[in-house]
UniProtKB/Swiss-Prot annotation:
This is Oxidoreductase NAD-binding domain-containing protein 1. Its EC number is 1.-.-.-. PROSITE patterns: FAD_FR. Pfam families: NAD_binding_1. The keyword Signal applies. PANTHER family: OXIDOREDUCTASE NAD-BINDING DOMAIN-CONTAINING PROTEIN 1 (PTHR46505:SF1). The keyword Chaperone does not apply. SUPFAM superfamilies: Ferredoxin reductase-like, C-terminal NADP-linked domain, Riboflavin synthase domain-like. InterPro entries: FAD-bd_FR_type, FNR_nucleotide-bd, Oxidoreductase_NAD-binding, OxRdtase_FAD/NAD-bd, Riboflavin_synthase-like_b-brl. NAD(+) binds at G178, V179, G180, I181, N182, P183. Residues 50-186 form the FAD-binding FR-type domain. Keywords: NAD, Oxidoreductase, Signal.
Amino acid sequence: MACAAVMIPGLLRCSVGAIRIEAASLRLTLSTLRHLTLTSIMKSKRKTDHMERTASVLRREIVSAAKVCGAASESPSVKSLRLLVADQDFSFKAGQWVDFFIPGVSVVGGFSICSSPRLLEQERVIELAVKYTNHPPALWVHNTCTLDCEVAVRVGGEFFFDPQPADASRNLVLIAGGVGINPLLSILRHAADLLREQANKRNGYEIGTIKLFYSAKNTSELLFKKNILDLVNEFPEKIACSLHVTKQTTQINAELKPYITEGRITEKEIRDHISKETLFYICGPPPMTDFFSKQLENNHVPKEHICFEKWW
């Protein structure tokens, strides 16, 4: 995953009280981190290596150890992880990713966080969803990782949604392809937290409407369907979604059918949501992000209103 920005069923739960980790033991030394990073870059001959692609992208200085406290299959090809990060200095903005350091694996992974910042604040937990590939970090997640495995994480990325209370209200259009849903789900969940906060306290950031366009090969590969529809039903006047499948071969179940469109997300669907109050966040394969960012520019959407992240 590289960043370019122009501005569970059966999931095992955990709590800080259930797994105690001393904060002092969660830090990697700077020399150790430098060794891990340089080793990864030198040993990887892939042009798509996460550390190489994101070398110029801003990162936080804090590197925190984390313990796997939950895992589940989100689809036939995607496994989700819950990580307990007890370090109180560890934080992130909705949409950002982590460098993922695995003991014994020289290659550093790069995975977007799909949970909201609020979950970290309340439970010291972040969630990731990792697609199966031959990349060593992904192979480790799918074939080796078990409960209580220890890793280290560092936050990075310039693709995020982090409004402040006094900021102007904005609508959001989120455009996701495949596992590109991960950072956009984090943003969607953060938006829902802001809506709840506003409803309960009558203050804080006043967010506009949120529309999610999400495309995958078939309904089995549409990740987090229940989470997304739960938010749509919780905030029917604020959150809407359009789920697209491009190679569906089985019957679509009745619960999903009202939200499903067979075929790709179209330019017209996106164009209908253009306004001066709308921010666009796009995450998916490079051809998809290139297409929609270009179409938005052609329709005179300011570049500062278009944020995108590419997945390889």
